[in-house]
Structures are given as structure tokens and as C-alpha cells.
């Protein structure tokens, strides 16, 4: 049916694996979408992850132009545009707005040694609080510190230092402006007050830069600008349409899954697996690790993440799933569908195989010495048990994170919503329900990040009065997985008596491995 009303929203989702252009109506119905796969990064050196900023923009343009070719009737129905993008991918621009080097993608692992410690009163306070190592780690991780140390000629020419969202926004509206909801990374941002840090804040010492290098910030739901004639020519988006501030991809997933109240937690089963709770109160679950800006104005996402989350499914597929990859080609399906069949006979607990999913080190708990572990092997175990243990281990880790969050926030969770690629797995969602002992719901659309961005636009443009209305009108549950009491009993015992003991018991061994092998580097 050809749309006649001008009340549709174009959401652009620039993720890690693909760029999507999506058209939603005010009911949250996905009218049409185009997905363009992208190469996440290239690696000039081991551990580096970079991509040309123009590559992202070209694929945004391609996704939009393909959308208009496939559905030319939709172009005249668009009332506004919203953008969501991967977090913590950094772009350096010169005085003409031209990228000076490839973007450093969030998956990059380089670190900077020898940064100047935070001094003065802040340095004394961190020393007294035992937080110096945490601040040092943040300094080592900051891309700006690496650029200033190793590519000073680039840093000296940098006029604007932007997240990918800020770069794409500039390409669309011609202004150096970005959403508050996209500020997730190593820049001098005040996460409590949702603005650039005050001049006296320690972050300007930890990551030195001029504030003029950073964009103007606009809260979610407010207008970033209007689509320029040049952007219209390149994307096909009608010029003059408003670009409404949304948020980073994880934040948009949270509201797209309907999680705007603290008793409904959002699990994101993506490359990085996270558990998020939306709160109007600023609470640091881990000291000095702030909650991130929500896609809801003046709210926060309390987030615990497993850096190598459902990346582990890709790891299993690459290392152990060759048979399923071949069969999937013959059966015209994806290997993950066959993995579901593979683990059907595996009992809860994977016959004693327990996995700790720290394939990448952490900051506090797990710490920088952490490694992944699988314990409990016997001669009965097969690939199927390993795959099942991956799904269980990720759910154990996220349950531990949610329990930390509940303790700090003094709120009990009543329901879980799941987004991300892993949300399409019935096995993963049933395991999650059984481990958490909570109902786990799959939203009506897989495109929760794009939907969340569209919800920001819908509220900002007055299609819905507020987020309570937007959630009611635009989000729905497709299927709910209820916990099974007898299965939860097994998982609960394994979680409390085995999984939660693993890290503290293995930590000294991880430290010895690190001392002997030098990996992960100190």
C-alpha cells in the first residue's frame, strides 16, 4: 500500500557490521529497510582498528539512495531524520572539515605509555582513594593521548575532534554539533551533568585538548540542524528536513526495546554484550566508570559490558563451525540456525562445562590481567557443549553485572528485554530466562537501535507527547521466554557455587600468566 501521510521517520543506523536506512511509522512499524554490509576496520598494525571516515559516509549515502530506489514513494512521507552510530569511534578533522587520518574504531586496542599523571588536588584524591591505576588506565586507553604522543603533526592540525556520530552529523547538516546521547568515549565529558566538563575537572588533565575542538552538544529529541542541499544530493534525503538528536547505538537499543523504567533491564546481545538499566539518578556501578547518557533526555544508562560478547559466537563459528558453514550454504540458512540444532541435546549446565567469557581484559572486575577460561572438560564433551557453555557463560556474566547494578541502584528487575543479533536465538533467550529466573522478551523488531532513534525523532517532532507514550505506541513484544523452575535450580547452583568463585580463584594464575608471557601487556 502506498503511504499518503507525511508522518514517517528515516532512521540511519551506522553500526559496526553494517549501515542501515530504515523507515518507521508512528506506530513503530518498520515500513522498509536497506542494509549495507561494511568492513568494520582494517589493521595497519596488530591490535589496531581503523577505517576511513568517508567510507562510513559513502555507505550512509548508498543505504539511503538504495532505499529511495526501492521505495520512491516513501521519500515524500518523511517528516524527519534521526541518526544512531557505533560508539567511541574517533575522527580528526582539519580546518576545512576534511579527515586528517583514518578514524580510530572502537575495537582498536592500542595504548599510550608515559602519559603525564593527573596532578594537584585531583591527583592526591585519586591516590588516597586508591584510584590512580584506574585513571592511568583511562589515560592509556584515550585515543587523543595516543595521537598527541605518536602523531603530533596530526594532532596539531586537528581543528575538530569528533565521534563518528558528530562527523556524520556535520556531513548532513553542515554544523559541528552532536547529540549528548552519543558522548561515550575518552573525551572530557561530564557524565553526571551531561555536558562538557568544567575547566577545573580532572578529565582535561587526563585527556588534554582545547574545548573548541569539540562539537556543540544538543540533548536527545532536539534539532541538530536541517539537511543541507549537498547532503540531499548525496543521500537523496529531501533538503530542509530536520535531523533530530538521538543517541549512540546501545542507548537507542535500550529505548527501542522499551526499557525506559529501571525495573525493566535491557540485554544487548551484540558484538559487545551489555546489560543496561535506565535511571534518572546518576549512579556509578563501578567507581569512576560512569553511567552513559541515555537516549531519554536527562537520564542515564547504567551499563555493565562483556567486551567480547556475542563476538564469541563468531569466534566459535570461525574456529569450530566449518561443518555448519558448509551445510548452511546448501540449506540456504545461517550457521547459527544449525548451532541451535547442535545444542538441543545438551542438558542445562553443559554437563559441567563452565565458561568465563573474559576473552578480552577489563578495567576493574575483571581487571587488566583477566583471561577467558573454560573448566570442567571430560571425555563426554563436544563442540555442542562448548557452544552451549558460551551462551551460558555470557548469561552468567550479565547476571552478575545486573546484580551489581541492582545493589547500587536499590531497584529490583522484574523483566528483561533482549536486543542485538543474539536476540534472534531461541536457545540463547531460554537459557537467559533460566539463568536470571526472569521473563525474557524479544521485541517486535530486530532493528531496536533504529527504532530507538526513530522514537527520539517522534518525541522531538511532536508525533508523540513523551517517551511513555512513544514506548506504548512504538514498541511491542514478539515473544516472551518464561524461566523453567527446575532448570533455574541447576543454573542457580552452578552460578553461585562455581561461576562466581572462578574469577577470584583464577586471578592469581592470570597474573602469573601475564608476568610470564607478557600478555596482556601491562
Residue ranges, per PLM feature:
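Conserved phosphate-binding catalytic cores of ATP/NTP-utilizing and phosphoryl-transfer enzymes
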Residues: 1-5, 228-237, 247-264
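Glycine/Thr-rich phosphate-binding loops that ligate phosphate moieties of nucleotide
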Residues: 1-36, 42, 79-117, 153, ...
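Short glycine-aspartate micro-motif
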Residues: 9-13, 21, 77-83, 161, ...
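Gly/Ser/Thr-rich active-site cleft segment
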Residues: 14-16, 27, 127-248, 313, ...
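Active-site nucleophile and cofactor-binding loops and adjacent substrate-binding regions
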Residues: 28, 51, 79-85, 104-107, ...
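N-terminal phosphate-binding loop and adjacent alpha-helix
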Residues: 34-76
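A polyampholytic, Gly/Pro-enriched intrinsically disordered region
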Residues: 55-56, 120-136, 236-237, 264-266, ...
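Phosphate/pyrophosphate-binding loops at sites that engage ATP/ADP/AMP, CoA/4′-phosphopantetheine
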Residues: 60-79, 151-155, 200-210, 233-235, ...
Amino acid at each position: 500500500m502506498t503511504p499518503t501521510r507525511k508522518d514517517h521517520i528515516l532512521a540511519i543506523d551506522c553500526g559496526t557490521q553494517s549501515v542501515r536506512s530504515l523507515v518507521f511509522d508512528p506506530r513503530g512499524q518498520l515500513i522498509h529497510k536497506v542494509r549495507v554490509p561494511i568492513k568494520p576496520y582494517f589493521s595497519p598494525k596488530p591490535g589496531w582498528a581503523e577505517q576511513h571516515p568517508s567510507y562510513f559516509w559513502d555507505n550512509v549515502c548508498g543505504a539511503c539512495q538504495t532505499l529511495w530506489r526501492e521505495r520512491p514513494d516513501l521519500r515524500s512521507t518523511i517528516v524527519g531524520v534521526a541518526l544512531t552510530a557505533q560508539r567511541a569511534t574517533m575522527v580528526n578533522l582539519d580546518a576545512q572539515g576534511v579527515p586528517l587520518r583514518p578514524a580510530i574504531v572502537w575495537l582498536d586496542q592500542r595504548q599510550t605509555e608515559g602519559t603525564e599523571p593527573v596532578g594537584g588536588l585531583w591527583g592526591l584524591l585519586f591516590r588516597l582513594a586508591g584510584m590512580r591505576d584506574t585513571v592511568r588506565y583511562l589515560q592509556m586507553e584515550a585515543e587523543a593521548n595516543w595521537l598527541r604522543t605518536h602523531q603530533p603533526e596530526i594532532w596539531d592540525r586537528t581543528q575538530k575532534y569528533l565521534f563518528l556520530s558528530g562527523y556524520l552529523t556535520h556531513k548532513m547538516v553542515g554544523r559541528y554539533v552532536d547529540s549528548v546521547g552519543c558522548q561515550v568515549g575518552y573525551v572530557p565529558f561530564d557524565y553526571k551533568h551531561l555536558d562538557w566538563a568544567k575547566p577545573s575537572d580532572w578529565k582535561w588533565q587526563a585527556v588534554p585538548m582545547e574545548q573548541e575542538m569539540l562539537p556543540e552538544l544538543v540533548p536527545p529529541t532536539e534539532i541538530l540542524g536541517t539537511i543541507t542541499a549537498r547532503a540531499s544530493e548525496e543521500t537523496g534525503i529531501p533538503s530542509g528536513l530536520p535531523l533530530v538528536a538521538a543517541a549512540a547505538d546501545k542507548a537507542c537499543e535500550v529505548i527501542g526495546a522499551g526499557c525506559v523504567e529501571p525495573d525493566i533491564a535491557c540485554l544487548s546481545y551484540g558484538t559487545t554484550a551489555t546489560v543496561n538499566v535506565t535511571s534518572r539518578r546518576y549512579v556509578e556501578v563501578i567507581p569512576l566508570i560512569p553511567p552513559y547518557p541515555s537516549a531519554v533526555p536527562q537520564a542515564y544508562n547504567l551499563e555493565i559490558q562483556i567486551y567480547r560478547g556475542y563476538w564469541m559466537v563468531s569466534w566459535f563459528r570461525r574456529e569450530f563451525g566449518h561443518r555448519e558453514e558448509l551445510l548452511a550454504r546448501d540449506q540456504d540458512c545461517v550457521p547459527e540456525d544449525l548451532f541451535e540444532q547442535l545444542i538441543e541435546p545438551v542438558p542445562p549446565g553443559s554437563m559441567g562445562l563452565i565458561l568465563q567469557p573474559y576473552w578480552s581484559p577489563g578495567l576493574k572486575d575483571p581487571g587488566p590481567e583477566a583471561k577467558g577460561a573454560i573448566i570442567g572438560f571430560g571425555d563426554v564433551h563436544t563442540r555442542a557443549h562448548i557452544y552451549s557453555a558460551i551462551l551460558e557463560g555470557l548469561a552468567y556474566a550479565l547476571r552478575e553485572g545486573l546484580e551489581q547494578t541492582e545493589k547500587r541502584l536499590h531497584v529490583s528487575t522484574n523483566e528483561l528485554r533482549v536486543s542485538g543479533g543474539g536476540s534472534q536465538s531461541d536457545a540463547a533467550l531460554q537459557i537467559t530466562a533460566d539463568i536470571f529466573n526472569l521473563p525474557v522478551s524479544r521485541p517486535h523488531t530486530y532493528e531496536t537501535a533504529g527504532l530507538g532513534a526513530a522514537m527520539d525523532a517522534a518525541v522531538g517532532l511532536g508525533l508523540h507527547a513523551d517517551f511513555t507514550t512513544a514506548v506504548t505506541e512504538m514498541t511491542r513484544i514478539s515473544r516472551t521466554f518464561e524461566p523453567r523452575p527446575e532448570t533455574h535450580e541447576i543454573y542457580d547452583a552452578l552460578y553461585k557455587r562455581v561461576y562466581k568463585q572462578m574469577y577470584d580463584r583464577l586471578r592469581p594464575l592470570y597474573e602469573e600468566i601475564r608476568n610470564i608471557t607478557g600478555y596482556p601487556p601491562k
